[in-house]
């Protein structure tokens, strides 16, 4: 490693924006650049992105961040990529031109294809071999939809003229001028086309969906030099790390070992627990997915998604208008000792893990004449912690592992009240790191390890510092009483919309 290679760049391609973040040897952020892009909603429940706009924004933020920081491409040791998972691009091999917009992970248009696969008895096969539930969320049915609905697409696919990729694959293809068609196991594991036991594309799933093997990228480790780019002008920079956003955050939080877990508090909450070298099947509504071990090798994880985390606070602000700013919630919630018996179940779009109840609806229970604004705000914050406790309980049951501490990241972790209540409700210490850009950091770490910029996972552990550790303070009886009230409230919210 020559002395002037002082930085690693993480490209963080998210659902609403593309970002580039420069890290130095001490994992400090030296510069960032960000651009939003257009969300397309052609029909109710459909969500698309323009792959060329994704590429344009991602390419330009990379150039911008170098210009902003005054860095030359010669000073960049490697590029790591982290991305929104499941979002699907199909393009022509010869021209590099997408044949349709990217179908986004949130898009529900393939629900009918999923129902058809269930009717053919594939649910158990999908669960056992891909670790996933049969749902429109994942890429496989999206590829089938494009082949079925774009004129001439299936014929071109059969002739080997089309390529498929998740966003990581598309970016690497563009950055290497069409030389490299690759993905990593974390992204492959979200397609419903990848066998997480054999770590190979699953021929049966490809046959069931009518997708030719020739469309698929090569699956390579999450930390490896895949190819080079001359973007940013001048020298060839190695592209050396790839991970889906949640797995990247798990790696960025240094959850390399079995039994370590992180929770990301964003619009929703994503909790992942590293379960080591063997996949753990969930009997409690979680997904079995691929994680990354300390040397970039394949590990496994359990994953649980809560739909309404920070979005519950947005609802207080935008719809109820009882706060002006999300940051106010800490102040109001701390003005009262409890919620005065009020529970808010934010099942506005149904409930995610571990319930998976699309018919649940938002519910506020336990209201009395004395209930006021502070109680409702506190109940909204507490609902985020209760839902995360639901997921953690399922994880501990499935894995047989008692969590020693939960690492946290995402916007809502700045809320001290929420973090303390989370620790109390889980009876588990909650660790907030100094650097909360853990998703981008994970991609940077993977790339840096691949080129020797950092020598080992032990060296990375020296870069991790704790801002604050929240220790449980609530007594057992109080915790049990409050959580039992939550379970009762959840029951009231369930199956509400079924009769519609």
Swiss-Prot record:
Name the UniProt key words of this record, in alphabetical order: ATP-binding, Glycerol metabolism, Kinase, Nucleotide-binding, Transferase
Question: Which Gene Ontology terms of cellular component type are present?
Answer: cytosol
Quick one: which residues bind ATP? 15-17, 267, 310, 314, 411
The protein's matches in Pfam families, at most eight in alphabetical order, are given as: FGGY_C, FGGY_N
Locate the residues binding sn-glycerol 3-phosphate.
15, 85-86, 137, 245
Question: So which residues are the signal peptide here?
Answer: none
Q: Name one GO biological process term.
A: glycerol metabolic process
Q: Which reaction does it catalyse?
A: glycerol + ATP = sn-glycerol 3-phosphate + ADP + H(+)
- Activation and inhibition: Inhibited by fructose 1,6-bisphosphate (FBP).
Enzyme Commission numbers on file: 2.7.1.30
One term of GO molecular function: ATP binding
The record's InterPro entries line, in alphabetical order, gives:
ATPase_NBD, Carb_kinase_FGGY, Carb_kinase_FGGY_CS, FGGY_C, FGGY_N, Glycerol_kin
> Disulfide bonds, which pairs?
none
Instruction: Give the record's pathway.
Output: Polyol metabolism; glycerol degradation via glycerol kinase pathway; sn-glycerol 3-phosphate from glycerol: step 1/1
- Coiled-coil blocks: none
Residues annotated as binding glycerol are: 85-86, 137, 245-246
Judged by the first EC level, this protein's enzyme class is transferase
Binding residue positions for ADP: 15, 19, 267, 310, 411, 415
The family line of this record is:
Belongs to the FGGY kinase family.
Primary role: Key enzyme in the regulation of glycerol uptake and metabolism. Catalyzes the phosphorylation of glycerol to yield sn-glycerol 3-phosphate.
What is the name attached to this protein's record? Glycerol kinase
